[in-house]
């Protein structure tokens, strides 16, 4: 009733005409009904409930008004909001950000009847749960809608989306993580701009590559620490509208939002220090009998590539052959650690790039 909604619009219209607004509360309805209640689409909610349930919703009228409710609800509280408007001081309550919100004026609801099943199950919701906000039902219900909305926005902006995720601890959708198939320079920044331009509730947006599982806290943290530079990869927007209950905002509902580009720079993807250290998959046809043959034909090669080329199971024979080439002064390595044939002092491995500098020295 305090946020912009159809219900608020209908009620303020009743007040302007001096009319009461009959309302029935269904307690303990089908769990998927709450999903429909949290959606904002230009259609009747009951129609959406039927669509999500996959069958028509049985409805019955209230006993003191004509408002229909799901017949399979556990309890129905009937009544009306009086015509006097927002007149009663209400609160404070724990709000969706996990902190207490200020007291505000609300309408008065008058109960006219309560009906329930004989074996009624009273359903309740966790709301305003402080540091345990991630357990609140509303967070998870809202995230489904926000994730779908964000995905549609990005697809309409020609951005190839791998996954979209609203973390449950982000106070009802103020944080959004997105993984994309990066295809051109600046795509992460374009995604951030498109999302902030269409979703006012977002406060921080994080964009990663498709190799990161954004639902895995460890992978997401790793991408943040290894691919992000604050002076290069953070975009901030001042004076943006946001969530009015955000306690960090001091001057009304306007504040600063930020986007974080946690993607690998396209122009550096082939660099060794941009290559994730993962266990190699040793599969493929055996192409050579000796290390010398492999390096004469296909150099430079990593050790794992030599194992694949020779069909080695553990690399022991490759180590022996590399040592023989080293003793003859024929073994070289490039700055990325790949092996090749060349001229070097006997008993030593030569460095193919004499300008290479050890970053650890």
Model regions and ranges:
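Internal mixed beta-strand/loop scaffold within catalytic domains of large alpha/beta enzymes
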Residues: 1-26
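Charged, compositionally biased interaction regions
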Residues: 29-297, 302-311, 315, 319-323, ...
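A short, conserved structural fragment
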Residues: 326-337
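Minor-groove-contacting beta-hairpin "wing" of winged helix-turn-helix DNA-binding domains
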Residues: 337-343
């Amino acid at each position: 009733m305090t946020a912009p909604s159809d219900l608020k619009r209908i009620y303020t219209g009743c007040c302007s005409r001096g009319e009461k607004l009959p309302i029935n509360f269904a307690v303990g309805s089908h769990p998927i009904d709450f999903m429909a209640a949290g959606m904002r689409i230009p259609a009747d909610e009951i129609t959406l409930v039927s669509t999500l349930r996959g069958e028509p919703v049985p409805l019955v009228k209230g006993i003191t008004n004509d408002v229909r409710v799901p017949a399979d609800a556990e309890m129905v509280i009937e009544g009306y909001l009086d015509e006097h408007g927002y007149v009663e001081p209400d609160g404070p309550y724990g709000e969706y950000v996990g902190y207490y919100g200020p007291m505000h004026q609300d309408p008065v609801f008058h109960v006219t009847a309560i009906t329930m099943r004989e074996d009624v199950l009273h359903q309740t919701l966790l709301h305003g749960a402080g540091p345990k906000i991630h357990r609140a039902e509303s967070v998870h219900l809202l995230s489904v809608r926000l994730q779908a909305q964000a995905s549609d926005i990005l697809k309409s902006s020609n951005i190839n989306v791998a996954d979209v995720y609203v973390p449950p601890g982000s106070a009802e959708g103020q944080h959004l993580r997105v993984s994309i198939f990066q295809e051109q320079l600046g795509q992460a920044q374009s995604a951030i701009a498109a999302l902030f331009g269409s979703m006012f509730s977002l406060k921080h947006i994080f964009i990663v590559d498709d190799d990161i599982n954004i639902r895995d806290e460890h992978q997401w943290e790793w991408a943040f620490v290894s691919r992000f530079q604050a002076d290069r990869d953070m975009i901030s927007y001042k004076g943006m509208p946001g969530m009015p209950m955000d306690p960090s905002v001091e001057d009304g509902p306007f504040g600063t939002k930020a986007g974080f580009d946690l993607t690998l720079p396209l122009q550096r993807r082939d660099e060794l220090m941009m290559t994730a250290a993962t266990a190699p998959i040793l599969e493929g046809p055996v192409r050579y009998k000796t290390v010398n043959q492999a390096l004469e034909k296909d150099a430079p090669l990593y050790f794992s590539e030599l194992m694949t080329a020779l069909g080695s199971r553990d690399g022991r024979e490759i180590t022996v052959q590399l040592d023989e080439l080293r003793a003859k002064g024929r073994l070289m390595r490039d700055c990325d650690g790949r092996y090749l044939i060349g001229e070097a002092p006997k008993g030593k491995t030569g460095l193919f790039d004499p300008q290479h500098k050890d970053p650890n020295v």
